[in-house]
Regions:
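Structured soluble/peripheral alpha/beta segments that form catalytic or ligand/cofactor-binding pockets
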Residues: 1-185
Length: 185
């Protein structure tokens, strides 16, 4: 493969909100997660002879930090996005399945670093036989979230170490649709 060199600086605005959630499944198992969105990123990435420049007006990182003791079997969906739209930094965070039935969610939208929590579950609908087909992500009871996610890349990682088995599908793509804020914006 080609040589990869990266020198990136991730800026973390001190006034930005973060999403922090503890999900207690029972007395023995829990998960804490912290999500920091739309972190302006600058620098360069070089792959072989190609050089890519990142500027903080168009390039963002996300910090996803978690700790906990998970149940033996778990399934979850996570979707996120960071971008600039109409001059504002917009971040999306949606989680599903792993929080179902707990009364808590990791669903939120960030606008210029200010988080608006979405307290309702979202439903991820997709073809488990073809993760590259478009997905829908919708709020369970309202019209707050109504998105289509269209993947253009899939990374698959499978592990079978007898006691531990996992299958991860990471898809990268584009969102299209609507997320309605409480203030109707």
């Amino acid at each position: 493969g080609e040589r990869l060199q990266a020198e990136l600086t991730i800026h973390h605005p001190t006034t930005d909100d973060s999403l922090n959630v503890v999900i207690p499944w029972n007395r023995q198992t829990f998960q804490f997660t912290a999500k920091h969105h739309t972190l302006p990123t600058t620098g360069t990435v070089k792959i072989g002879n190609r050089r890519y420049t990142f500027n903080e007006e168009e390039s963002y990182s996300v910090l996803d930090y978690g700790r906990g003791i998970w149940p033996r079997e778990a399934t979850w969906n996570w979707g996120m996005a960071s971008q600039r739209m109409r001059g504002r930094r917009i971040g999306l965070n949606f989680g599903g399945k792993w929080t179902d039935g707990t009364g808590m969610t990791e669903n939120a939208i960030f606008v210029d670093g200010v988080m608006t929590k979405i307290h309702e579950d979202v439903i991820f609908e997709y073809d488990r036989n073809d993760f590259m087909k478009p997905w829908t992500i919708r709020s369970k009871f309202s019209e707050t979230v109504d998105l289509t996610f269209t993947p253009f890349f899939e990374r698959v990682a499978k592990t079978d170490a007898k006691l531990i088995r996992s299958e991860v599908h990471q898809v990268i793509g584009y969102y299209n649709g609507i997320v309605k804020l409480e203030n109707c914006s």
